[in-house]
Amino acid sequence: MRSIAAFAGVTQNLALVIYTKPGCPYCQQARDHYNSKGIPFIDYDAQNDKKRRAEMFSYSDGDPTVPCIVENGKYLGSGWGDPPKG
């Protein structure tokens, strides 16, 4: 399963959003995890998209760590080890 398409202004309506940066191995682990579970998500580039970076900071209270996981508009955590519980 692939991540669903990114549409501006709909982050609040999506069940799962992952803020990432290109080349981040932890971000890829998060993507692989959710894909393996068949859980649709949207993947935003928080490194190159200033709007998405600001959005990520609003959820994470300024924490720049990626991946930043948001589910149903609720911040679950940043970084990747075990999948966050939501």
Model feature map: region roles:
Residues 3-42:
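Local sequence-structure signature of Cys/Sec-based thiol-disulfide redox active-site neighborhoods
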Residues 8-10, 58, 67:
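Short secondary-structure boundary/capping segments
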Residues 22, 45, 79:
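Residues at the C-termini of beta-strands that transition into short coil/loop
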Residues 25, 48, 76:
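Glycine-/small-residue-rich active-site loops that bind phosphorylated ligands and cofactors
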Residues 45-63:
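Thioredoxin-like thiol-disulfide oxidoreductase module
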Residues 60-70, 80:
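Structural micro-motif
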Residues 71-86:
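Non-catalytic, surface beta->alpha helical segment in thiol-disulfide oxidoreductase systems
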